[in-house]
């Protein structure tokens, strides 16, 4: 019953997306690209939540909050390094599926089905890619994209990490629902690991 209610919350929470043509009009738990994190967290909370990354490029700062919501286990945000306003360039909410990727796939398919109804006119596709942090190629991102003409996107991913990556970073398999600005997406695809 909780899963059904959580999916309904997710669906009703994103219905405004159907008429939006700008990624900043989309929200996850009321938060969106272009918002200041200061609208949701204190500066102390932000500074105390900065996390290291496996990215070689340090253009963006990552923070994570594990005070989940009714549906999500936690949130991750990226903003430009030294940005005193902490403007959100990317955000994602996640659910952990420790060593249980099959359940992640089931939840991903449920969310994709519902979101696809809302995004009828936006290019969407599924793609499995190797995770850049794992040079062995054993960690996979099973991604579903909704791409906007601006270059921004919405992603619904199941991240399936290898045992090596789990040991190195303590990353567990998870579902992520995320928003990325076009600028952040360009950085992620072309600069982040160079």
Locations of the language-model features?
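Sec-dependent N-terminal signal peptides
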Residues: 4-17
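Sterically constrained small-residue positions within well-ordered secondary structures
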Residues: 11, 68, 82-84, 135-137, ...
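Compositionally biased P/S/T/G-rich terminal and signal peptide-adjacent segments
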Residues: 64-87
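Non-cytosolic coordination micro-motifs
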Residues: 20-62, 90-194
């Amino acid at each position: 019953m909780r899963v059904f209610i959580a999916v309904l919350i997710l669906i009703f929470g994103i219905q405004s997306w159907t008429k939006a043509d700008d990624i900043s009009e989309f929200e996850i738990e009321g938060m969106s690209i272009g918002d200041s994190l200061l609208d949701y967290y204190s500066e102390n909370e932000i500074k105390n939540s900065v996390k290291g990354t496996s990215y070689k490029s340090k253009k963006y700062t990552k923070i994570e909050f594990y005070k989940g919501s009714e549906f999500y286990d936690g949130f991750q945000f990226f903003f430009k390094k030294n940005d005193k306003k902490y403007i959100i360039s990317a955000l994602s909410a996640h659910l952990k599926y420790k060593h249980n990727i099959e359940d992640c796939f089931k939840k991903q398919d449920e969310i994709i089905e519902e979101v696809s109804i809302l995004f009828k006119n936006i290019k969407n596709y599924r793609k499995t890619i190797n995770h850049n942090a794992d040079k062995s190629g054993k960690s996979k991102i099973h991604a579903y994209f909704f791409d906007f003409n601006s270059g921004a996107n919405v992603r619904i991913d199941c991240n399936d990490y290898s045992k090596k990556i789990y040991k190195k970073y303590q990353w567990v398999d998870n579902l992520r629902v995320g928003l990325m600005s076009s600028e952040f997406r360009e950085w992620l695809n072309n600069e982040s690991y160079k």
